[in-house]
A protein has these predicted regions:
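Structural preference for solvent-exposed beta-strand-turn elements
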Residues: 7-166
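Extreme N-terminal basic, low-complexity initiation segments
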Residues: 2-6
Length: 166
């Protein structure tokens, strides 16, 4: 076998040349950390269909949060497919503690809610067994885009009357 290493930007590529050509297919399971932001962004769309969804606890919690907000969720668990519909013009802009406390990804609905409805109230997240994971980078970015943000009684209260710009 011959190994060649190429430096490509910050990523590396490993090229392997062997005596036999490799053929076939492999199944790559879905990623929770890729799916959660996509789910949060469905607040901005009218209809979304996602394939290869990993049905794990944080995904189920995010789906409960989206249902609470007002999005219809249809699961096809045997095929790892999700269908989401956002038919309401007015939806709930609150992400309550009971749903956000078990996963830090709940803060991801803040941007889409602000974008679409110009206001949001999202509980400070929990759910991390390895220590506190601050949301200050999210808040910093939203402030730079024009949001007014305050923390009160365990909630992030955000407003962007003129919308988010940037």
């Amino acid at each position: 076998l011959l190994f060649q290493r190429y430096k490509v930007s910050l990523m590396q590529k490993l090229l392997i040349k062997g005596k036999k050509e490799l053929k076939g297919n492999i199944y790559i399971s879905g990623s929770k950390n890729a799916t959660l932001p996509i789910l949060a962004s469905t607040i901005l769309a009218s209809e979304v269909r996602l394939l290869n969804v990993p049905f794990v606890k944080d995904i189920f919690t995010m789906l409960e949060l989206l249902k609470f907000i007002g999005i219809k969720v249809k699961m096809k668990r045997n095929k790892n497919i999700l269908e989401l519909k956002n038919e309401k013009k007015e939806i709930n802009t609150l992400a309550p503690y009971k749903l956000v406390k078990t996963m830090r990804a709940g803060v991801l609905v803040l941007g889409p809610l602000l974008t679409k409805f110009k206001k949001a109230k999202v509980s400070l997240p929990g759910g991390c067994a390895i220590g506190t994971r601050p949301v200050d980078l999210h808040l910093f970015a939203l402030k730079k885009l024009g949001a007014k943000i305050k923390i009160k009684d365990g909630y992030i209260i955000a407003e962007a009357r003129k919308g988010l710009m940037g």
